[in-house]
Amino acid sequence: MADKIKAAGGIVIRGKKILFIKKNGRWEFPKGRLKKRANKKKTALREISEETGLKKKDLEIIQPLIPTHNHNKANGNISIKETTWFLVKFTGDPSFKLKPEKREGISKCKWVTLNKLEITLKNSRPLVHYLLGFVLNDPGYKDYLKNQRK
């Protein structure tokens, strides 16, 4: 029987930029496991804050996104990770210096403009492409973009 792991994460936006973390050599979005009886929204905000240094008070959940499921096999054990994703807006100072959580294998954090996404996505898993495609075509995100300058 497979172990079931629940996680939550966020696709963080600031103007027309999206936040990525480089974890174990690949670009992805911040996420982490739910602790027992933990709230998914609070977990997503906590993980974003821990992995990037952004303050939770400067993060605002806009809407939930689709969940994803990953199947992993290690040492003969199968695990299924279900991640609940949220679209999150960064409302803090744009000049805030991101602080990657090195102990988690995160070597870098960066804001990527929409026109530079292709370069970043060259070194990311298909799941990241899938989530990004979903977000970029989401009506809520398109409405958000209409009110942004850069």
What kind of region is each of these model predictions?
Residues 119-150:
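Charged phosphate-binding loop/patch that engages nucleotide di/tri-phosphates or the phosphate backbone
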Residues 26-28, 35-36, 126-127:
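Short, surface-exposed beta-strand-loop junctions and turns on beta-sheet-rich folds
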Residues 8-13, 37-38, 149:
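Short acidic/polar alpha-helix capping motifs at helix-coil junctions
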Residues 34-124:
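Unchanged
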Residues 1-30:
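N-terminal strand-loop-strand
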Residues 28, 62, 66, 77, ...:
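Residue-level signal for alpha-helical context at structural boundaries
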